[in-house]
């Protein structure tokens, strides 16, 4: 039989989370962000759950082609724009909208010969200092684009650096409003964190919102708030089984480096999951895990193919017992991916994207 580890994607939960995002901004259209292969879930696996989106936002042409191949005829936005001039031809052929964030991209458009004018989102660097034109240069970039016959419509967008934290977004909203005042076109500034935390503000919702991590059941502001606090459902479950049981005595150690020492008699289960499956190696003793739907903890260091769990809360568990590394157990109990990520010093986004190719994936509602 195959190794018992399995990832399960839940399209119904994806759909629920999309509707949750829409409730946060009922008067705006929603971009479903499916970059990085839908945050590791697989674009094709989540597509049915996202059909109700108003558009799909992603990073590259290959992802755009996959969405079109699924039958989507609505808007698709390239969040980083094109990476070289020849990409513009495929944008025309596929009917893609694309961000413009630098002078070179404007130059490429000016030299592009096309019968199909492009719809673009002009990106502002309102303080994150990643991509986009500074507020001081934004209007001149807009004027250059507006003069091009290759450009049909210009929308305005920016990205928040601190929507999930105490610094907030007011300073960036102000910079964006000042620089775009009186410019025509649609606006898009809210990401998942802004949508959930600041979506009640009409100055944030605007015409479009970008729903990213919120679609995949992770809280953008964990641990301040949990996914359940935002009514988000887990969209990925990583589960395995116990393949070995050991009975420890006081003084026995577990795993590489002997990082855990038993203080007395202790039953542990050995689970078929390790860092080669995408489980974070930095998750030390105490990381939450579910065995037969009962919450317990990991023991010792995570190795390439295995990890150990404390069986004290589930004394009847033995070979073949269900182990939920994150997501929803068979009995309905939920272990948020954010809690596991926090124990490993990272974020839920990274765990989703890091699921290893050797892990089988199924789709199940």
Curated annotation (Swiss-Prot):
Specify which residues bind substrate according to the UniProt entry for this protein.
Answer: 130, 304
Annotated catalysed reactions = L-alanine = D-alanine
Q: Which residues carry this modification: N6-(pyridoxal phosphate)lysine?
A: 35
Going by the record, the broad EC class of this enzyme is isomerase
One Pfam family cited in the UniProt record for this chain: Ala_racemase_C
One GO term of the cellular component aspect? cytosol
Molecular function, one GO term: alanine racemase activity
What EC number(s) has UniProt assigned to this enzyme?
5.1.1.1
Q: In which pathway does it act?
A: Amino-acid biosynthesis; D-alanine biosynthesis; D-alanine from L-alanine: step 1/1
Q: Which family does it belong to?
A: Belongs to the alanine racemase family.
Example GO biological process: D-alanine biosynthetic process
Q: What is this protein called?
A: Alanine racemase
Give cofactor(s), names only: pyridoxal 5'-phosphate
Please name the taxonomic classification of the source: Bacteria, Pseudomonadati, Pseudomonadota, Betaproteobacteria, Burkholderiales
Briefly, what is this protein's role? Catalyzes the interconversion of L-alanine and D-alanine. May also act on other amino acids.
HAMAP family from the xrefs?
Ala_racemase (MF_01201)
NCBIfam families per the record?
Answer: alr
Q: Which domain of life is it from?
A: Bacteria
Which keywords appear in this protein's UniProt record, sorted alphabetically? Isomerase, Pyridoxal phosphate
Which residues carry out catalysis? 35, 256
